Amino acid sequence: EPFVLCHAAGFFIAIVAEQLHGDDPPAAGPGPDASVAIIIPARHEPKQVIESTLLTCLNMDYRNRSVYLLDDSSIESYKQEACELAEAYGVRLFTWDGNRGAKAGLINDVLAGLQEKYVAIFDADQNPMPMFLDKVLPFLEGDPKLAFVQTPQFYSNTDVSRVAKISHAQQAVFFEYVCEGKSSREAMFCCGTNVVLRRSALEDIGGFDEGSVTEDVATSLKLHLRQWRSLYYNKAYTFGMAPEDLGAYFTQQNRWAMGSIQLFRKLMGIFFTNFRALKIHQWLEYLLTSTYYFVGWAYL
């Protein structure tokens, strides 16, 4: 019961924060002309899925950008398809045969050779709208201490199965209410896609955290520990694909659960050795995030 009450209180706080701050857009800077690297990590994705994402990224209104397709596939047919797509659409292809740090290691290797000021990341099944960068970049240009701007992740294939429909509903609660609360309490974390990051902020912490299966949240913690700020912009400019069967859904949830456990262990180490590294409300939000998947143990 204490576990449930704590998380219920956390959700209530998020709702209140959303009501207080949700209608007040943050101040944005002038229209940007900074360079942006659009990164699309892919591993064993169907050709048509990657192609759709490439097309939507290339169709963005913002022109000062370069598109990078990062292929981490181990099967030759997928590698060949990625090569064909990169050649057909004139995007830069980065192939990787390493196994260091999974997605984080792949992105870090690419980051080492980038010169662009900002990095936009979209999973291979996420389709951004043409105005995405025009809407998001002004916030980063207006605040030099803003490390990243996270936007919602909503699914467009909810009619495929009940699993997809339920996954969408689960995500909707998180992105509509919880994220607003976390952002207002200076603890919004990167969700790994539909996000634009400042490259210098990533360089400041040595790139994405390669020691966690949820590199996005672990990296966000590192940024907040270094006093970088984050922002959640609650406008849906990207639509993706939900898990369509129970196998895919449980694989997704298992990865998030494992990442939460890893985050909790790291938090405890910092909490008892360097409590002043975060503000009280940041600690509370990160503890709620890292213990969410403990709900099963709470009912044992």
Q: PLM features: residue spans?
A:
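Short, acidic, metal-binding catalytic loop of nucleotide-sugar glycosyltransferases
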Residues: 55-64
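A conserved acidic beta->alpha catalytic loop
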Residues: 71-82, 98-99
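Cell-envelope/extracellular polymer assembly enzymes that use nucleotide-activated donors
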Residues: 34-37, 66, 218
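N-terminal membrane-anchoring/stem segments of glycan-assembly enzymes
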Residues: 1-32, 86, 285-300
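Catalytic donor-sugar/metal-binding loop of nucleotide-sugar-dependent glycosyltransferases
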Residues: 211, 220-239
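A conserved hydrophobic helix/loop-capping motif in glycosyltransferases and polysaccharide synthases
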Residues: 37-45, 60, 139
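Long helical/loop segments within the catalytic core of UDP-sugar-dependent glycosyltransferases
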Residues: 87, 94-118, 130-213, 224-225, ...
